[in-house]
Amino acid sequence: MTTGDCCHLPGSLCDCTDSATFLKSLEESDLGRPQYVTQVTAKDGQLLSTVIKALGTQSDGPICRICHEGGNGERLLSPCDCTGTLGTVHKTCLEKWLSSSNTSYCELCHTEFAVERRPRPVTEWLKDPGPRHEKRTLFCDMVCFLFITPLAAISGWLCLRGAQDHLQFNSRLEAVGLIALTIALFTIYVLWTLVSFRYHCQLYSEWRRTNQKVLLLIPDSKTATTIHHSFLSSKLLKFASDETTV
C-alpha cells in the first residue's frame, strides 16, 4: 500500500486529478486556499481513500497516518515503533490496510502486529466485484452442470437398458459396445466435474487467503502509553517547526 501527497495551489496542475469525482471535489472546494491532498492505494492499485484538506485547517494534535484525520471520531493508536506524525493510526484504518496488503507488520519499522485473521464467507466471494471472467466461468460451469447431469443420467440409463435388451437376444457385441459407451460417458462426466470443481475451489481459496478480515489485538495499557508518547512527539515537532519559522 502506498500514499501519494501533493499540494494544490491556485492555478497549479498535478497528476492526481484523473478521476471525475476527484475533479468535482476540487471544483466545489475553496480555490482561494491551498489544499493538502492525500490518496491511499493498495498494492493492486485500488484506491482506498482520498483526503482533501485546506492547509490552514490541519489539526495541531496527532493524526492518523492513513486517513490524516484526528482522534475525534475514533481513538488513535500507536501499535508499532514509528514516532512523530507516522506513529499514530486508527484501528479500523490499520485493519483495512493490513487486509488489503495481506501483511501483518508495519511497512516502515517492520514491527509485527498481533492480529487475528478471519476468513470471509462464500457469499462475499460471489458478491465481490473482482475479475468478471471468473464469475462468468463459474456461471457457465453451473449451467453446464445442471444441463449435463440429467442428460448424462438419462443417456447412461438408456445405454444400459439397450445393452440388457441385446443380451436377451444374444447380441453380445452390441451389448458390450453400449456398456463401453456408458463407461466412457460417465468417465468424461466425472473428470469434467472434478476439474471444474477443483478450478473454482482454487479461485475461492486464493480469494479467501488474500481477503481475510483482520482484527488488530492491542492491550489497553500499551495503547495508552504509546498514545501519550506520540502526542508528546507531535508537540515537539510542532514546537521545532515554529522556532524554525521565527
UniProtKB/Swiss-Prot annotation:
Q: Pfam families, alphabetically?
A: RINGv
Stored Gene3D superfamilies? Zinc/RING finger domain, C3HC4 (zinc finger)
Its recorded reaction(s) are: S-ubiquitinyl-[E2 ubiquitin-conjugating enzyme]-L-cysteine + [acceptor protein]-L-lysine = [E2 ubiquitin-conjugating enzyme]-L-cysteine + N(6)-ubiquitinyl-[acceptor protein]-L-lysine
Name its cellular compartments.
Answer: Endoplasmic reticulum membrane; Lysosome membrane; Endosome membrane
Q: What's an example GO BP annotation here?
A: endocytosis
InterPro entries referenced in this protein's UniProt entry, alphabetically? Znf_RING-CH (IPR011016), Znf_RING/FYVE/PHD (IPR013083)
GO CC annotation, single: cytoplasmic vesicle
| ZnF (RING-CH-type) residues | 56-116
Enzyme Commission number:
2.3.2.27
How is it placed in the membrane, per its record?
Multi-pass membrane protein
Q: Give me the segments passing through the membrane.
A: 138-158, 175-195
The pathway entry for this protein reads as: Protein modification; protein ubiquitination
Question: Recorded GO terms, molecular function?
Answer: ubiquitin protein ligase activity; ubiquitin-protein transferase activity; zinc ion binding
- Quote the SMART domains the UniProt record gives: RINGv
Q: Which residues bind Zn(2+) 1?
A: 64, 67, 90, 93
What does the UniProt record say this protein does?
E3 ubiquitin-protein ligase which may be involved in endosomal trafficking. E3 ubiquitin ligases accept ubiquitin from an E2 ubiquitin-conjugating enzyme in the form of a thioester and then directly transfer the ubiquitin to targeted substrates.
Comment block on domains: The RING-CH-type zinc finger domain is required for E3 ligase activity.
- What protein is this chain from? E3 ubiquitin-protein ligase MARCHF2
